[in-house]
Swiss-Prot record:
Organism: Allochromatium vinosum (strain ATCC 17899 / DSM 180 / NBRC 103801 / NCIMB 10441 / D)
The protein's name: Homoserine O-succinyltransferase
Translocase as UniProt keyword: no
Site feature location: Important for substrate specificity: 196
Encoding gene (name): metAS
Residues binding substrate: 167, 196, 253
């Protein structure tokens, strides 16, 4: 939580210059401290529905040990669901109508599976636009993850994602470009982020649309950017919410697709994820799978537990820090009535007072 500058100590001014959140006493006195209500628009397919819930709930819950968070999951009825996932949604999720009536302080929008290159033809397209447009006028800040970033960049900023020559898949080093922005204050200036995508929006596209790039990788491209006002829309291209084993699960799925004939090539390793010994084990497993298929036998199971024990997580702490900063900033400027966007005196075009709107 931020420090209140209750006197003229020069350290307060110095910390402000470094990007630290320092509150003026008058501002602090008018804050209405209460619980925060965060919406989670979960558009992930059935197999990843509950895992995605856990990943984002975990990040939110770990971001601050003092504040109280109510997370409200919902989805779009236009997304096709199987019986089990549909029952889960009907029992535990709220409707968008209920979300809209009650209001939110913040909104997170997940990625989704797509059936073709044109996002505008996907069943979620129009209802997603409705949610995002409502959130822009009624929610303090919206965080878009991966494909949601690409969709919002297309319909709100006119920037279409571009197909990559090969899937950007693995764990990549990143650096903070805007060190004084409050979203990345006091996090590591260099850190890792997982990526898993076939498409990209470039640095030039973000900047050309008036957005601000905060975190980037030479190998993986832009990870974190914000809307022209500096805060009301936050964009991830990577997956900082991923569990340690998330990429392993994806690799296992792709091996299964190869074994079932759904893909013609054996999947490559995610970049910078498996160690030397693990790669040796998986190379041996690949030979066994191919040999079994050639002989008409059932392929051996991937030794998932053995592999998982050797994996390292090099991104979660920084992800927790960024989400913690995001939640803290929302706490400072959101209205005490969650059906309204900002507390009195906040400029919607520059809510953090960064003069970047």
């Amino acid at each position: 939580m931020p420090i209140v500058a209750h006197n003229d100590l020069p350290t307060f001014a110095r910390l402000r210059e470094e990007g630290q959140q320092i509150l003026d006493p008058d501002f602090a006195l008018h804050q209405d401290i209460r619980e925060l209500h965060i919406g989670l628009l979960n558009m992930m397919p059935d197999a990843a529905l509950a895992a995605t819930e856990r990943q984002f709930f975990r990040l939110i819950g770990e971001s601050n040990q003092i504040a109280q968070f109510y997370v409200h999951p919902f989805t779009l009825k236009e997304l096709e669901r199987g019986p089990e996932a549909r029952a889960h949604v009907e029992r535990y999720y709220q409707s968008f109508d209920q979300i809209r009536a009650d209001g939110l302080d913040a909104l997170i929008i997940t990625g989704a599976n797509v059936t073709g290159p044109d996002l505008a033809l996907e069943p979620f397209w129009e209802p997603l636009i409705e949610v995002v447009d409502w959130a822009y006028d009624n929610v303090c800040s919206t965080l878009c993850s991966c494909l949601a970033t690409h969709a919002v960049m297309q319909f709100r900023y006119g920037e279409r994602r571009r197909r990559l020559p090969a899937k950007r898949w693995g764990v990549f080093p990143h650096r903070v470009l805007a060190r004084t922005h409050p979203l990345v204050a006091d996090v590591n200036t260099c850190f890792d982020v997982p990526h898993s995508r076939f498409n990209d929006i470039s640095h030039a596209q973000f900047v050309g649309a008036g957005l601000h790039v905060l975190v980037e990788s030479e190998e993986a491209g832009v990870h974190l950017a914000v809307s022209p006002d500096g805060f009301r829309q936050v964009f991830f291209q990577g997956h900082p919410e991923y569990d340690t084993i998330s990429l392993l699960k994806e690799y296992k799925r792709e091996v299964g697709r190869f074994a079932a004939g759904a893909r013609s090539d054996y999947p490559p390793f995610p970049d910078n994820y498996f160690g030397l010994q693990t790669r040796a084990i998986l190379n041996e497993h690949r030979e066994c799978v191919i040999r079994a298929l050639d002989q008409g036998r059932k392929p051996p199971e991937l030794p998932e537990r053995l592999i998982a024990a050797a994996l390292h997580n090099t991104w979660h702490d920084t992800a927790e820090g960024v989400i913690g900063n995001w939640m803290g900033l929302i706490y400072q400027i959101t209205h005490h009535d969650r059906r309204q966007t900002f507390m009195a005196g906040i400029d919607p075009n520059d809510p953090l007072g960064l003069c970047c709107g």
